[in-house]
Swiss-Prot record:
Listed name of the protein: Preaspterpenacid I synthase sttA
Binding annotation for Mg(2+) 1: 105
Task of the protein: Sesterterpenoid synthase; part of the gene cluster that mediates the biosynthesis of aspterpenacids. Performs both prenyl transferase and terpene cyclase activity, converting isopentenyl diphosphate and dimethylallyl diphosphate into geranylfarnesyl diphosphate (GFPP) and then converting GFPP into preaspterpenacid I. C22-oxidative modification of preaspterpenacid I by the cytochrome P450 monooxygenase sttB then leads to preaspterpenacid II. It has still to be determined how preaspterpenacid II is further modified to produce aspterpenacids.
GO molecular function per UniProt: geranylgeranyl diphosphate synthase activity; lyase activity; metal ion binding
């Protein structure tokens, strides 16, 4: 405690005697601190709220549907506890930033994500503005903000509330450009991460992992670096990431605890309960706990993580030297953010609502509504009312060698995920399926072969010859589909679907055809990923094991080919079943494989040809299919075709760069994985063209035992060589130049086809400014 207090300069430990009544629902064990500048924060929030309401009136946003509850509560201000050590001169702007983020984000309709105190608004989002209006507001804000950041081009927003929001961010960056830009990078990363997955049919461990990655925790921490003027490098952050993730996990689960009734109410009224993402809901749905049981588990999990953080911080402090002072401030700020947020949530009106339309009985309908088997939570007793929600009597359950309860019928095929066992398999599902397999499939009972039901109908028996002349029976598809189903379940941003929707603003493809094109592109993309991972010998895909590590190379290839054939069949059902771009995809991949097999470094010109066919081919396929199906009769637009070709190049070169320079990419694919693959990426081609010792590099890359990764020390050597010849700097220059050309190509396309704010915001959002900062 002394070590933590010594770091604080502008706050004091909270005096609980100052609060009457005390928040009865506060259970966090962290020390809580209070800013000395609370009055300034409250005053700034009040003034900003008045201006925001006036802006909403000008923009035609109905006040009766926007319940503005700012950071201020009856006990004080959110920031006085969450950012207690904020520099005095930054208190007012920080309060405005918090309210701006809360209000602006809070107008969004329910989207399926779990709200988080560090990024969302204390407003009733289920009664907020329409999705169409919110999309218009988002594009207006995004184009104005990203244009200024990426190209220095100042575009004034059309909406008054966006003018206020953009000005707040301008002021934020002007005060401290270093931490201000870092904050925007984390904000964008948070928004990107939210789009990757939902949490249905997910284990508790996997849920916590995903929430840490996709929540606003890192965004809130980046704001704390700005408020406290903390200067810390990415390497220093990485060295204590285990502690910041512990803190974030506790804060996220605390938010789930307090926000569950409100979130359930919002999703219930909007008809999106299947998209409710909350730890309490997950424990009820996937594990069968009651709301009270689930909340007690959440409490324990929060306290466990808080104790681990305190112990970990003490251990770190004992071995940390005087040069780690800034890291110490960073860690204490992170803890204070979670501690203060927990104190605020324990009494804020946002969570302690009396106007909810739903009741505890309504929330109880979630219990046991998993998509498959109920799970068993390691370290906790089973739900007390388990007998009342399972589809089979508990008496038929058995225990495995680890003491986990499982149903007899599920033992043979139960899976273990992160130590949590699938148990209590549901039976008698539709279409004759049982436990996820066709009812007619062959099985073994007591070591004896049991024939499919259809064969038994023909009077066959174990010793009968009739099975050899029985009618044709189509094989079940589940085994062939399994590898594809696995990769399809992995988190994804679904950028291609978004791009298709945005292109449709220009091309006007009928809904049924657009749906088929999306399915074609989705199947082709996932099929190519399965094959790419085999051809590249990749162990990871999107941070998870690659498909072939589970299903083997042969079965994965078979599944990928099966899906590819199905995609081609879907293409033939469209008006223009031209397969040119499908051929180009394979020709591009063949170049990549040929260069690797023969260890031949291509020229930059050859590299671009490969990219245009392999990566750009899928983009052009999307365009050609949509043009053929368009309700607007026009030939393939050359400007739009060029735009998508440049987009494919930018995607690939950005991917090449991130493979070597991004910590996030490293966590998903491994450290410099392109070196393991022997892939001739743009950085490697540049290095081999400029280093004095190209033979050393190629010898290390291509004279290895098959299936072995390049040693870590050799990867560091290659990176050092790249540093010497400025390879990564060159890659950055290429990205900057290519992005400028992308925006020029977009200008030309809009001149021909009309404005497309959605595509403009997408291209601005993937620009190099936030990528390279």
């Amino acid at each position: 405690m002394d070590t933590i207090s010594d770091v604080m300069k502008h706050c004091v430990p909270i005096n609980y005697d100052d609060y009457d009544p005390l928040p009865a629902d506060h259970f966090s064990t962290y020390p809580v601190f209070c800013s000395k500048a609370t009055a300034e924060a409250i005053e700034a929030s009040a003034e900003f709220t008045r201006k925001w309401k006036r802006a909403c009136e000008v923009d035609g946003l109905h006040q009766d549907k926007l319940n503005f509850q700012a950071c201020t509560t009856h006990l004080g201000h959110y920031n006085q506890w969450a950012y207690p050590d904020c520099l005095p001169e930054r208190v007012s702007l920080n309060a405005v930033l918090s309210d701006c983020a809360f209000f602006w984000d809070g107008m969004s309709p329910v989207t399926g994500r779990s709200t988080n105190v560090m990024i969302t608004s204390p407003v009733d989002v289920s009664d907020s503005i329409s999705a169409e209006k919110m999309n218009e507001l988002t594009q207006d804000f995004g184009i104005a903000m990203l244009s200024e950041l990426q190209s220095g081009r100042r575009i004034e927003p059309r909406f008054e509330i966006n003018k206020m929001a953009v000005q707040v961010i301008r002021d934020f960056i002007a005060v401290d450009p270093f931490t201000g830009i870092g904050h925007l990078k984390e904000w964008k990363g948070h928004l990107d991460a939210q789009e990757k997955s939902t949490h249905n049919n997910m284990s508790w461990e996997k849920y916590v992992e995903h929430r840490v990655n996709e929540s606003g925790g890192n965004w809130g921490i980046s704001v704390g670096c700005w408020t406290n003027d903390i200067r810390i490098s990415d390497e220093e952050k990485e060295s204590v990431k285990y502690l910041t993730q512990l803190a974030c996990a506790g804060g996220i689960l605390g938010n789930d605890y307090y926000s569950f009734p409100k979130e359930f109410d919002e999703h219930h009224r909007s008809g999106t309960l299947d998209r409710l993402q909350n730890g309490v809901a997950l424990l009820m749905r996937e594990y069968g706990y009651t709301e009270e049981e689930a909340k007690e588990i959440i409490k324990k999990e929060v306290i466990i993580r808080e104790k681990k953080w305190m112990d970990g911080f003490d251990a770190w402090s004992r071995q940390a030297g005087p040069e780690t002072g800034e890291i110490r401030r960073y860690l204490v700020m992170t803890m204070a953010l979670m501690s203060g947020s927990m104190f605020w949530m324990s009494h804020a009106g946002r969570y302690h609502r009396t106007d909810l339309a739903t009741t505890a009985e309504d929330r109880a309908t979630l219990i046991g509504k998993s998509r498959g088997a109920l799970r068993v939570l390691a370290g906790y007793p089973p739900p007390k009312n388990l007998e009342g929600i399972v589809r089979e009597p508990l008496a038929s359950a058995v225990q495995d060698d680890n003491g986990h309860v499982q149903h007899k019928d599920a033992v043979a095929d139960s899976s273990v995920r992160n130590g949590v066992h699938h148990a209590f398999k549901k039976r008698n599902s539709r279409n004759g399926k049982q436990n996820g397999t066709e009812g007619s499939k062959s099985t073994f009972t007591n070591g004896n072969y049991v024939q499919p039901a259809k064969l038994q109908q023909h009077g066959t028996s174990i010793n009968s010859m009739a099975i050899y002349t029985a009618p044709f029976q189509e094989a079940a598809g589940d085994i062939c589909d399994a590898p594809y189903s696995y990769i399809d379940s992995l988190p994804s941003k679904k950028n291609r679907n978004k791009l298709l929707d945005l292109l449709n603003d220009w091309l006007q493809v009928p809904p049924s055809s657009l749906k088929r094109i999306k399915n074609i592109v989705h199947m082709l993309h996932n099929s190519s990923l399965m094959l790419d991972d085999i051809e590249d010998a990749s162990a990871l895909r999107r941070g998870q094991p690659a498909t072939h590590t589970f299903y083997g190379i042969s079965q994965t290839i078979n599944s990928a080919n099966y899906v590819y054939v199905h995609a081609v069949h879907e293409v033939t059902r469209l008006y223009n079943p031209d397969a040119d771009e499908l051929r180009n995809l394979h020709r591009g991949q063949s170049l990549d494989l040929y260069w690797r097999h023969h260890a031949r470094c291509p020229s930059m010109e050859e590299y671009i040809v490969m990219v245009d066919n392999k990566t750009g081919g899928l983009f052009r396929l999307m365009l050609r299919l949509m043009t053929a199906e368009s309700s607007i009769s026009r030939p393939l637009d050359t400007a739009l075709c060029r735009l998508l070709t440049l987009t494919g190049r930018y995607y690939q070169i950005r991917d090449d760069y991130l493979n070597l320079a991004s910590a996030d990419y490293e966590s998903k694919k491994g450290f410099c994985e392109d070196f393991d693959e022997g892939k001739f990426s743009l950085p490697l081609i540049h290095l081999l063209s400029h280093t004095r010792y190209p033979d050393r590099i190629t010898s290390a890359l291509f004279n290895r035992k098959p299936g072995t990764n390049l040693p870590y020390e050799m990867k560091r050597y290659i990176l050092a060589e790249m540093e010497e010849v400025q390879t990564l700097a060159y890659s950055q220059d290429v990205l900057k130049y290519l992005h400028e050309e992308l925006m020029h190509a977009l200008d030309e396309t809009e001149n021909r086809l009309g404005a497309n704010d959605g595509i403009r915001m997408m291209l601005l959002g993937m620009g190099p400014k936030l990528l390279l900062c």
